[in-house]
């Protein structure tokens, strides 16, 4: 049987919520392979099905991305263990998220973070536009639902189309990567800087430039 370290047992316990001794035995029986150990625990009915749901993603890394010295992003992406935080797949995910923020310029991570005042203002604007277009009063609220979805796609990171594959949203991409990694993954917060932001100057579409670069990657 393979030698099983205390750290390995700790990592498997955090993944499965199974007991320490069960985790140790699973790793020993699986030759130290985490995927096989998890499968062993599931077959024995030891791994807790609800374990992942109740766990907190409190580890992770701070990722950064700078495009041509003109757009900079700092983003915090969380996972459940420091073991995964060191995983190349997780670090690649963080890089992709940072580049998405640079290219698409979201204002919030998810729609629950959008202030009510912002939503009310956007609804008023869209409602007035629809009225000027002669849309029937009875249809306004229904049309507004679609308009607000478009608004969320513009300002919320997880609702945006992924710049590397516009057939899926960023939230879907993150969920797919999280499933592959085997842990809960969550974007907590980010900051995006653009050179000269707030200063009146010649219009340069830096976001489009970043998106073009990503498309060539």
From Swiss-Prot:
It is found in: Cytoplasm. Disulfide bonds: none annotated. Transmembrane segments: none annotated. One of its GO terms (cellular component) is cytoplasm. Pfam families: EF_TS. Residues 81-84 are annotated as: Involved in Mg(2+) ion dislocation from EF-Tu. Its main location: cytoplasm. It comes from the Bacteria. Keywords: Cytoplasm, Elongation factor, Protein biosynthesis. SUPFAM superfamilies: Elongation factor Ts (EF-Ts), dimerisation domain (SSF54713), UBA-like (SSF46934). GO terms for molecular function: translation elongation factor activity. Coiled coil: none annotated. Associates with the EF-Tu.GDP complex and induces the exchange of GDP to GTP. It remains bound to the aminoacyl-tRNA.EF-Tu.GTP complex up to the GTP hydrolysis stage on the ribosome. Belongs to the EF-Ts family. This is Elongation factor Ts. It comes from Myxococcus xanthus (strain DK1622). The gene is tsf.
